[in-house]
Structures are given as C-alpha cells and as structure tokens.
Amino acid sequence: MPARAQNPISVVTGGTGFLGSHLTDRLLAEGHCVIAIDNLITGNTANIGHLAGDANYRFIEHNVSDFIFLPEEKIDYVFHFASPASPIDYLELPIPTLKVGALGTHNALGLAKAKTAAFILASTSEVYGDPLVHPQKEDYWGNVNPIGPRGVYDEAKRFAEAMTMAYHRYHRIDTKIVRIFNTYGPRMRLRDGRVVPAFIGQALSGQPLSVFGDGSQTRSFCYVSDLIDGIFKLAMSDFHEPVNLGNPREMTIKQFADEIIRLTGTRATTEFKPLPVDDPKVRQPDISRAKEILDWEPRVRFEEGIKKTIEYFRESLAAPR
C-alpha cells in the first residue's frame, strides 16, 4: 500500500459487510488508506468490488478471532466492525458470534495497542435488550436475557464494550464506542432476516409481508450514510463514553409494512406470525449526546432513504443469477 506519509491508515474489521464497506468508502473519500479484514462468513466481496485497483485499499481474508498481524509500523485507526449482526446469522452461528465479541475484540484492541491506534467499537442498541426505559439513553444498563437465543449477540457486544473500556482505563488506549440502532440502505443482504430487506424483498416478489406479533412493536430506522457520518465524527473526536447513533423517528412495524407496500407500489398484503423470543417491544435512541458532542443528527428523510433502498433491491432481484 504505497501511502504517502501524511495519509492516515485505518483498519476495518468486517470490511466487506454492509456497514464495514460503507465505512471503507467514507474513509477512502477522507484520504485514508484502508486495510479491510473479513473472513467472509457473512460479508460479501461484491460490496468492495468497486475498490479493485485502488492503491489506497487492501483486503485481507482473515478471521479476527485469531491473532491479527500487520507489518505496518504505524496504524492510526482500528474500526472493529466484524460480527454476525442479523438474527439469522447469529442464531445460526452462536459460538462464532460470541468468539468475535470476545477474542475478536481482544485481538483488535491488541492491534490498536501495538500500533498506537485509536480504536472504534461497533456496538449496538441490542445492549439495551428489551428495554424498560424509553427512549434509550447511554446511561441505561439494559434488560437482557443472557441465556436466550438472542443473548449470544447481545452479550457479545456487552462484553466487547467492557473489554474496550478496560483497555481504555488500564492501557490508556484511545477508544470510542458507537451504539448502532436499526440502520438500512444499499448492500444489505436480501435474506439476512432483518425487517427492512425482508419487507422490501417480500413486497417486490409479490409475497405477503411477514409481521411478527401484532405489529405494535416499534423501531427507528437510520439511513446508512447518516450513520457513517456519525461514526466518522465520533472517530475524529476525543470522546470515550458510548454514543447512540440512530434516527429517533419511531414507527410501529405495522406502519413500516404499510409504508413499504405504498413505496414499492405493489399490492402486497401483511401476514401476522408469532413474535420471536426476547424480541424488543420498543426501540428508539435518545441522541442528545451525539447532538451535543458530535453536532450530529440524521438528515436523510425516511421516504428518501427507503426509495434508494427499494431501488437497490429491485436491481438486485432483476440481476442475472
């Protein structure tokens, strides 16, 4: 990687995933050289295909739950985004999910320590579990079932946060923690089990939209470019406590299904199914801290972002297989 001396070097674990690939694009646009690391168990090289031949980009296929060695003498930022993140993935891969939250975080922090790099952890709103406080602020400790099927992801991220703060306090590593709420946009996998691709895929395929429970549970949806902007601002800041990033505009799942049907222009219907175990009833970020510390808030309107996402999936479904 023939970087000029003044170019920051960033490592992105999970670099071929939905968020990791968008983050990579932003870092490159900001003049960073990027080393992306991914074992491809849930990532997709199609997300980084446009970077082929970019002299400031390098991809390494590697499982970060194993020791990470990089020959670069100096690295400026380590973004730890590696982890199965959709219910389908972490229910199918419970032990790898726990390992990347524990061993993967430990290895990524070790890399940051060895290279004197800032460390940015991709955490999640799932650390709040099925919250009893609404909306959720960063000082809420959560309501998590540690032995439930979702617990592998929730507790992996809670442990990762604890490990990150331990490295910050004990080793004086420059660390940041971003708690990511529901995010959507191009490069999501059509069949990853999350509600945005699920509803859009079903609507475009003429299938009923699967609404779990009675549809009264709520979510807040943030477009990916807004999220990445917040992550970049946090990485460049000197703030070390967790920060919520998400869109506080809240809607019920039934309302969301109706919006998808309207915006896809289809005649799809909804079909109600049993609610999964430990599925959160409400989810809405309090972003007061992000506004104050980062001067950040989401800017992409819901309809604008969803239309872009629908078009992405429409093209994906039409592409030859």
Segments and roles (model prediction):
Residues 42, 186, 247:
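Short, conserved catalytic or interaction motifs in soluble domains
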Residues 53, 148, 188-192, 249, ...:
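Residue-level signature of the cytosolic catalytic core of signaling kinases
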Residues 4, 9-10, 23, 29, ...:
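C-terminal substrate-binding subdomain of Rossmann-fold SDR/epimerase-dehydratase oxidoreductases
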Residues 1-183, 203, 225, 231, ...:
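N-terminal Rossmann-like NAD(P)+-binding domain of SDR-like oxidoreductases, especially those catalyzing
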Residues 83, 98, 188-192, 220:
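Nucleotide-sugar-dependent glycosyltransferase donor-binding/catalytic pocket residues
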Residues 186-189, 280:
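A generic structural signal for short coil/turn motifs at secondary-structure boundaries
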Residues 134-135, 190-198:
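A glycine/serine/threonine-rich, flexible loop-to-helix segment
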